[in-house]
């Protein structure tokens, strides 16, 4: 076991105990100092981020992935503001969610408490570093971060700034830490740090999620993989459908709530597809369509079976013509990743059927999948989008970083 892991695990465990009973004011003061420090030391962050960008370009990293990695002054301000926004959110720790009295006179309550030490493994998104730190701090959890090697310089600087701010706020050393060793061997050891980690949350592509699920012995909350679909019903508004698919695919193609597949009812395909594909191509999107799609719009690439289950995270879209709503639902439930799915329709009964029968964390009617986000849902910053069903599902905000403690008040009762 890597010695860095043991040292940081012990520090995190000690910090988690102190954080568990820190007051809301103490935690909010720490968040305020983090937010202010990120803005004050923006130039330091950008200097380190420049190093990461230069290395990524040398490696031939795609433009979409570079966009996830790149920081500028506005993005750093946005990160700092997201931290400050967490201050405004209600502190769930200590909340008694229910209280009941037993016939023997015992009063039993259910209280929200921190998870303890949260481990987060993620890829080339420096904003995750600050978001995760803020949410864990607010909920009284210590956090150990393991970011991707692509963003190591940016992440180390952000955590350095956070650590200085927490020290100034009088919060414990070890509250927020990051692994400097980004090797796969250390990552695997991190996934098995059961003595110190209470939960492990991976954020990234399918490869990362699979590696964590297959290797971890620490309890895992799966997040992130988004093979999201937009289904255009035969009773859809054409203009609305075009606007939604263009937004869902092109606004930020490298994020997990971006659309990766477009399903179109055969009754509307000849009217819808030429308009939609033209608009998508104008945004630089490569279309990979089924044979029926290619008959309608010839200037596209043919999709393979592999395409239907793939999360591109790029300016690529799979397009398939389906017979009806039932085939669309069947296709989504077979190839989707249970993240976010959307139907465009004017038919109420079709929309209700889609909502009931599609198995996903977020299911939309006449809206872009890009709204699956903690901020957009009003939760503030998120720790990730859970695609599993146990403990948490969908955008994970503050409450999803807590667990229950039973508190029992007696008056001398014995059994």
Curated annotation (Swiss-Prot):
Gene3D superfamilies: Aldehyde Dehydrogenase, Chain A, domain 1, Aldehyde Dehydrogenase, Chain A, domain 2. This is Gamma-glutamyl phosphate reductase. Belongs to the gamma-glutamyl phosphate reductase family. Catalyzes the NADPH-dependent reduction of L-glutamate 5-phosphate into L-glutamate 5-semialdehyde and phosphate. The product spontaneously undergoes cyclization to form 1-pyrroline-5-carboxylate. It comes from Clostridium perfringens (strain SM101 / Type A). Its EC number is 1.2.1.41. It is found in: Cytoplasm. Keywords: Amino-acid biosynthesis, Cytoplasm, NADP, Oxidoreductase, Proline biosynthesis. Pathway: Amino-acid biosynthesis; L-proline biosynthesis; L-glutamate 5-semialdehyde from L-glutamate: step 2/2. Its main location: cytoplasm. NCBIfam families: PRK00197.1, proA. One of its GO terms (molecular function) is NADP binding. One of its GO terms (cellular component) is cytoplasm. Disulfide bonds: none annotated. It comes from the Bacteria. It catalyses: L-glutamate 5-semialdehyde + phosphate + NADP(+) = L-glutamyl 5-phosphate + NADPH + H(+). CDD domains: ALDH_F18-19_ProA-GPR. It is an enzyme of class 1 (oxidoreductase). It holds the Pfam family Aldedh. GO terms for biological process: L-proline biosynthetic process. InterPro entries: Ald_DH/histidinol_DH, Ald_DH_C, Ald_DH_N, Aldehyde_DH_dom, G-glutamylP_reductase_CS, Glu-5-SA_DH, GPR_dom.
């Amino acid at each position: 076991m890597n010695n860095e892991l043991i040292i940081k695990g012990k520090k995190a465990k000690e910090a988690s105990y102190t954080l568990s009973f820190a007051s809301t004011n103490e935690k909010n003061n720490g968040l305020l100092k983090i937010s202010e420090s990120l803005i004050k030391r923006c130039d330091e962050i950008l200097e380190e981020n420049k190093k990461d960008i230069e290395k990524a370009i040398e490696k031939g990293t795609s433009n979409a992935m570079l966009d996830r990695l790149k920081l500028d002054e506005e993005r750093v301000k946005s990160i700092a503001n997201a931290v400050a926004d967490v201050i405004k959110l209600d502190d769930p720790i200590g909340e008694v969610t229910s209280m009941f009295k037993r016939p023997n006179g015992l009063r039993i309550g259910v209280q929200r408490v921190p998870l303890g030490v949260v481990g987060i493994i993620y890829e080339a998104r420096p904003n995750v570093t600050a978001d995760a730190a803020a949410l864990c701090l607010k909920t009284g959890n210590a956090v150990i971060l393991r970011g991707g090697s692509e963003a190591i310089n940016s992440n180390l600087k952000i955590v350095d700034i956070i650590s200085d701010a927490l020290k100034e706020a009088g919060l414990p050393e070890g509250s927020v830490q990051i692994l400097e060793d980004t090797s796969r061997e250390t990552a695997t050891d991190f996934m098995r740090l059961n003595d110190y980690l209470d939960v492990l949350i991976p954020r990234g592509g399918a490869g990362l999620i699979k590696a964590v699920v297959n290797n971890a012995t620490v309890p895992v909350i799966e997040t992130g993989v988004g093979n999201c679909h937009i289904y255009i019903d035969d009773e859809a508004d054409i203009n609305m459908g075009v606007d939604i698919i263009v937004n869902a695919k092109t606004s930020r193609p490298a994020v997990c709530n971006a659309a990766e597949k477009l399903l179109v009812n055969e009754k509307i395909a000849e009217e819808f597809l030429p308009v939609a594909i033209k608009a998508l191509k104008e945004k630089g999107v490569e279309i990979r369509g089924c044979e029926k799609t290619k008959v309608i719009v010839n200037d596209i690439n043919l999709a393979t079976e592999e395409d239907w289950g793939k999360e591109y995270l790029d300016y690529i879209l799979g397009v398939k013509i389906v017979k009806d709503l039932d085939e669309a639902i069947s296709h989504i439930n077979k190839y989707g990743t249970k993240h976010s799915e959307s139907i465009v329709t004017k038919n109420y009964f079709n929309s209700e059927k889609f909502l009931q029968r599609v198995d996903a964390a977020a299911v939309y009617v006449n809206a872009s999948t890009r709204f699956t986000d903690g901020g957009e849902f009003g939760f503030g910053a998120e720790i990730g989008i859970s695609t599993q069903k146990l403990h948490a599902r969908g955008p994970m905000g503050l409450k999803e970083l807590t667990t229950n403690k039973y508190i029992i008040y007696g008056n001398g009762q014995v059994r």
